[in-house]
């Protein structure tokens, strides 16, 4: 399949990952992209979803829409995260099947993996345990996309695939302290501390947990590659192939933002999953994907983007 001659529907297309996927589709020659925005279409309402497909008439669906957040947001809203993600996925795939969509790309999450899966995570270990408790409702909801896609492939010969991105970062991320993930949260804290002349930044947890991070533009490229080239029922990991502790991450962000004060780790806050890192062999062998943005470069771009956006907001509110 080539996206250049297809009508592509991208749910969540104006979000953090979505805007980069739309840009990547355009780089691959796709000129007919429909972006679904929440204020225009509620994917948890079947009537909205039905109308969407009748209007857009897509050949391909890339389902990115999700209710997401960091450890705190997952802890406070487990029911919302489960229900809304399950409903959006189930309704979107069902109506894609009904109208004869040629390819459905379900974008899952590393949170689907068992809490104590061997590191690096292999796709074959996806069902060998329950996800980490702090984000299990979200992870299980996204995992249902995989189950539904495999069931539809078996019963209806519906071409659905499932990709598993690791933690993402980059420009246009969510920097809201109430719901952001670790990188934007630390970037914001350090930048604000520098501006305020503060001598301390408080980080959640022990700092011992490890994570892998994939630059958002690299992930977008991987998703389009998978759309064109991957046609198997098995899930496929999308990652950068490295692992870093939260403590080392915080020190790196502090250095890049110019924060020279003290990093304090609040051990009363949860670490989340002890380790996260993906084996990316399947993606490399199946559609030639390898991340091209090294971590310090990606962080620098993210920090600079945040500083520019912060300055713009300061001007508009002055």
Sequence positions of predicted segments:
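N-terminal Rossmann NAD(P)H-binding glycine-rich loop of SDR-like oxidoreductase domains
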Residues: 6-28
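C-terminal substrate-binding subdomain of Rossmann-fold SDR/epimerase-dehydratase oxidoreductases
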Residues: 22-28, 192-318
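Adenosine-cofactor binding site in Rossmann-like domains, unifying the SAM/SAH pocket
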Residues: 28-51
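Flexible, glycine-rich beta-alpha linker
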Residues: 42, 112-114, 137, 161-183, ...
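NAD(P)H-binding glycine-rich loop region in Rossmannoid oxidoreductase-like domains
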Residues: 46-85, 98, 115
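Short-chain dehydrogenase/reductase
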Residues: 82, 86, 134-146, 176-184, ...
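Conserved Rossmann-fold NAD(P)-dependent oxidoreductase catalytic core, especially the SDR/UDP-sugar
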Residues: 90-135, 161
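Active-site Tyr-X1-5-Lys
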Residues: 133-166, 185-195
């Amino acid at each position: 399949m080539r996206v250049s001659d297809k009508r592509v529907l991208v749910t969540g297309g104006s979000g953090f990952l979505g805007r980069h996927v739309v840009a990547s589709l355009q780089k691959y020659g796709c000129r007919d992209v429909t972006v679904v925005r929440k204020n225009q279409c509620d994917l948890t309402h079947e009537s909205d979803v039905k109308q969407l497909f009748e209007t857009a008439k897509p050949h391909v669906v890339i389902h990115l829409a999700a209710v997401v957040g960091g450890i705190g947001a997952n802890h406070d809203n487990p029911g919302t995260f489960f229900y809304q993600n399950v409903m959006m996925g189930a309704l979107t795939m069902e109506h894609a099947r009904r109208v004869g969509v040629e390819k459905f790309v379900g974008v899952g999450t590393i949170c689907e993996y068992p809490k104590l899966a061997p590191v690096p995570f292999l796709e074959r270990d996806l069902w060998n345990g329950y996800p980490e408790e702090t984000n299990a409702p979200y992870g299980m909801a996204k995992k249902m996309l995989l189950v539904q896609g495999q069931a539809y492939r078996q019963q209806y010969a519906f071409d659905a695939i499932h990709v598993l991105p690791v933690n993402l970062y980059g420009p246009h991320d969510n920097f809201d302290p109430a719901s952001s993930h670790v990188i934007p949260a630390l970037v914001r804290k350090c930048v604000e501390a520098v501006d305020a002349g503060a001598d301390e930044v408080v980080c959640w947890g022990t700092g011992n947990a490890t994570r892998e991070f994939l630059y958002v533009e690299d992930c977008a490229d991987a998703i389009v590659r998978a759309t064109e080239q991957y046609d198997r029922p098995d899930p496929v990991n999308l990652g950068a192939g490295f692992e870093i502790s939260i403590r080392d991450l915080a020190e790196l962000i502090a250095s890049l933002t110019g924060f020279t004060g003290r990093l304090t780790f609040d051990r009363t806050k949860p670490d989340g999953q002890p380790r996260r890192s993906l084996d990316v062999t399947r993606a490399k062998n199946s559609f030639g994907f390898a991340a091209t943005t090294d971590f310090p470069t990606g962080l620098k771009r993210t920090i600079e983007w945040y500083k520019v956006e912060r300055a713009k907001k300061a001007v508009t509110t002055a």
